[in-house]
Amino acid sequence: MVTKAHLDKVKSYVDLGLKEGAKLKVDGRGFRLQGYESGFFMGGCLFDEVTPDMRIYKEEIFGPVLSVVRAKTYEEALRLPSEHDYGNGVAIFTRDGDTARDFATRVNVGMVGVNFAIPVPLSYYTFGGWKRSGFGDLNQHGPDAVRFYTKTKTVTSRWPSGIKEGAEFVIPTMK
């Protein structure tokens, strides 16, 4: 992490997840990087049995904490991220191409990983956070970055027959 305050905040989410009843399968809170013991490092943490009523599900943690939310049906798996307040990203792991295409098309999030985690933070992937997960009015990479520096113009033309000279400055109406 960049600061001790952020490290402490992420660790507090892990503590909160345990208090709320999630099962911590991998605990990286004790990670130390040799030679950098005073740094703000934390190993990965993996929660299982996370439910939508838990804060670790409801809030974006911005740290190495992954939550597994189990869905009973495909439609529930599609609905959970689509109805979440944040629309940053989701991953689906499947061997069924039709299911992957359907999920990627229907899910209401900005980034979808199929058979691998969400493709960030590599700069050549577009950041597509949606809903409360977006930052600003444009995405930071990809077409929106180009649009930010582009001046666009819309021209609407109409060339009716019968006007020989002069100009008309009225909206045509049906007679």
Question: Each predicted region: which residue ranges?
Answer:
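Short beta-strand to alpha-helix junction loop
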Residues: 1-10
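Conserved C-terminal structural/oligomerization subdomain of aldehyde/semialdehyde dehydrogenase
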Residues: 14, 37-175
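Short beta-strand segments
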Residues: 25-28, 92
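Short, solvent-exposed loop/turn elements at beta->coil junctions and helix N-caps
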Residues: 28-35, 117
